[in-house]
Amino acid sequence: MYCTHLKTLQLVVMATLWVTPVRAGTDCRYGCRLNNMTITVEREDCHGSITITTCAGLCETTDLNYQSTWLPRSQGVCNFKEWSYEKVYLEGCPSGVEPFFIPVAKSCDCIKCKTDNTDCDRKSMATPSCIVNPLEM
């Protein structure tokens, strides 16, 4: 009788531990999701700040310790799944000024990094020289 209860308890614990990481990934605080961001917009006749909806967060990715010709390297990045352009007028602009058209995210997803419009290198080539690896200091 004791062994039966122990086996049942082991099965319940194993099932709970198996489901927990699955739920943690979807409820993760830093996962890929919609995020409000304030940006500064300028043009000759006016300037100001606007708040847009964009995508931000972490995506699960793997990085092999060795280069392989059989296994393609890919990195997951948080990017727009669905988006549209929205017309934005800045406060303080003279009347008759053309509006800004800003891409606004409607939904986000972790997708394979597309090298045609995203810097997918491990260390960006555009990294400012003042940023150094603390291990190299």
Swiss-Prot record:
SUPFAM superfamilies: Cystine-knot cytokines. Keywords: Disulfide bond, Glycoprotein, Hormone, Secreted, Signal. It is found in: Secreted. Glycans are attached at N36. One of its GO terms (molecular function) is hormone activity. It comes from the Eukaryota. One of its GO terms (cellular component) is extracellular space. Disulfide bonds join C32-C78, C46-C93, C55-C108, C59-C110, C113-C120. Its main location: secreted. Residues 1-24 form the signal peptide. SMART domains: GHB (SM00068). One of its GO terms (biological process) is G protein-coupled receptor signaling pathway. InterPro entries: Cystine-knot_cytokine (IPR029034), Glyco_hormone_CN (IPR006208), Gonadotropin_bsu (IPR001545), Gonadotropin_bsu_CS (IPR018245). Heterodimer of an alpha and a beta chain. Belongs to the glycoprotein hormones subunit beta family. Involved in gametogenesis and steroidogenesis. This is Gonadotropin subunit beta-1.
